[in-house]
Structure formats: structure tokens, C-alpha cells
Amino acid sequence: MASAKIRNIEKCKEEVLSICSEYQLNVLDISSKEIQLDDLHKQYVIDISTDCEDDDIYDKVYTRCGFINEERLPDADLTVNLNEVNI
């Protein structure tokens, strides 16, 4: 089954948050920005602050976000940064 294409950063952010939720990654803060690379291409940058210390969870989240990048973004590249915050 083909997944719908993602055409804006807010929808992309929702997808990333749902992946974090699926793997029980505690999201403390999330920010995003869209960078226009040229006339046709954009970059979506999503920064997530978390108190998670489990590298296995990080790997799973990055892998799933990579799927979004490869399969579902027709005109943008996605960069997800997971930043561990000590509370």
C-alpha cells in the first residue's frame, strides 16, 4: 500500500511525532524550520529535545524517519535531530 505524499512541514512534524510516540520517545520540545534550497527543493529540519537515553529507540526513530524521507517527501529532504537533554 502506497503512503500519501507529505507536502508541508506541519504534516511532516505530525508524522515524526507519531513515530516518537510509537517508540515511546518522550518529546520535551519540538521545533521545525523549512529551508528553500532552490526553486524546486526544500529541506525540512525538525529538532526534538528528549530525556531518552536509549540508543536503540533513537535508531528506530531515525530509521522510520528515513522511510518518510525516501518514500513520502516528493520535493523536500528531511533532517531530524534528536537532542538528549539532562533534566
How would you describe each model-predicted region?
Residues 31-80:
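Acidic, low-complexity, intrinsically disordered interaction modules
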Residues 7, 26, 72-74:
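Exposed, low-complexity/repetitive linear segments and helix-based recognition motifs
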Residues 9-28:
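Short amphipathic alpha-helix segments
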Residues 84-87:
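Short acidic DE-rich linear segments
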Residues 1-7:
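Short glycine-/aliphatic-rich beta-strand segments at the starts of folded cytosolic domains
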Residues 2, 17, 30-31, 48:
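Intrinsically disordered, low-complexity segments enriched in Ser/Pro/Gly/Ala and basic residues
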